[in-house]
Design a protein with these regions (language model features):
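Active-site anion-handling motifs in enzyme catalytic cores
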Residues: 1-379
């Protein structure tokens, strides 16, 4: 039975882009908050807290949020903490929100060594404190992706309001023995491979990405667009909307001839895909035997569908989530020479019992977190 949280309003974008067939690439990118992977954790939270929860965009004026009759605002979060983003504007708005607030899935972004803690902009520090001041008494009301992000909260004096739970998308599939299903699938022949595409400007991954593009070709696989705008435009074949420099970099990232734009355009037409509904995304993943790429949520949705996957953990946000949730991963240096169909399986380091035990542990902690915030749930 689905839970009823009549006292809850979600501050987030929708879980799906219903009018995706009618949108151009730029509008698709805007609809998913600049990364379609965001749909994974928004869908998870929506499913876990109940059907048809009222929803208000985070960017709405505080007066609009306050006009909703619910007493608790739940905010699905991404990797907001870091030098890359100043949350001053949102902190100013949240200071005027007259509700208890709960953040789910907050992450910090830094280099993959996760030793140095970022010096947050003052606006982001204020943002954290606005959440901390709107907790349910002493109960933690900020779920974070892992111990690294928790240390960032500690640096700014709000660690008592945080708890490390990974990402709610870990619990989309209700199967308590999901790990064994993934392990069994990993024993099957690898015929088709899906790759959640990296950002074409991530030069440190270009050598790996070239090999993944070749892997897609060799297995009649697919190259899934998640971010940025230009990749959705390429998926839509809106090449006249993509500047020449970006097209050049897109070609270099895949090892395609820089001057032969027709070759690049044909490749994207043949292999690119994009999905804007999470159940449809997971169902699509079942058409493939393996998934590998630098997008944690692209890999996560495959795993939730029972399809083996490997995340290329190239920064703190991906590494932290993989380590917290026992998601199979490699570092870029591990596959510096690239990946082929014949070597792919050798990089899949996965213990189904450890994975299932970690899911159970985090599910129990997640349930306690939700209960502490007065939220009913289905996990």
């Amino acid at each position: 039975m689905s839970p009823r949280n009549d006292h809850v309003v979600l501050l987030s974008s929708p879980t799906t882009v219903d009018d995706a067939p009618f949108r151009d690439g730029a509008a698709l990118n805007q609809a998913v908050g600049n990364n379609s992977g965001n749909l994974a954790f928004i869908h998870a939270i929506d499913k876990q807290l109940g059907p048809a929860l009222p929803r208000v965009r985070r960017a709405e004026k505080p007066e609009t949020i306050n006009q909703t009759p619910q007493s608790v605002a739940v905010v699905p979060c991404a990797n907001h903490l870091g030098v890359h983003q100043d949350l001053a504007g949102e902190a100013k708005n949240f200071a005027r929100v007259e509700k208890r607030m709960v953040a789910i899935g907050l992450g910090a972004q830094a280099h993959a060594n996760m030793t140095d803690l970022p010096d947050l902009p003052e606006g982001s520090v204020r943002w954290l404190k606005e959440f901390a001041e709107r907790s349910n008494g002493d109960a933690p009301n900020i779920s974070v992706r892992g111990e690294y992000t928790l240390r960032v909260l500690e640096k700014y004096g709000v660690a008592d309001k945080g708890v490390a739970l990974g990402c709610p998308s870990l619990h989309i599939n209700p199967d308590r023995e999901l790990g064994s299903k993934i392990a069994a699938a990993a024993e099957q022949p690898i015929r088709r491979v899906a790759v959640p595409s990296a950002h074409y400007r991530w030069r440190h991954l270009w050598k790996v990405e070239k090999s993944l593009g070749k892997l897609v070709e060799d297995t009649h696989g697919t190259y899934i667009m998640q971010s940025p705008k230009e990749m959705f435009q390429a998926y839509r074949a809106e090449w006249d909307q993509i500047d020449d420099e970006s097209q050049k970099l897109m070609a270099e990232a895949l090892g395609k001839p820089v001057e032969d734009r027709e070759s690049l355009h044909d490749w994207y037409r043949a292999y690119s895909s994009a999905i804007f509904d999470v159940p449809a995304w997971m169902n699509f993943m079942r058409d493939f035997d393996f998934v590998i790429g630098a997008r944690i949520h692209g890999v996560m949705l495959a795993l939730q569908a029972g399809v083996p996957g490997i995340c290329i953990a190239h920064d703190s946000r991906t590494l932290e989530l993989c380590q917290t949730m026992e998601i199979p991963y490699v570092r870029p240096a591990d596959i510096a020479d690239g990946v082929t169909k014949s070597t792919l399986r050798s990089f899949f380091r996965f213990d189904p019992e450890v994975f299932d035990a970690k899911r159970a542990e985090l599910r129990t902690k997640y349930a306690a977190f939700l209960e502490g915030n007065g939220l009913k749930y289905s996990l």
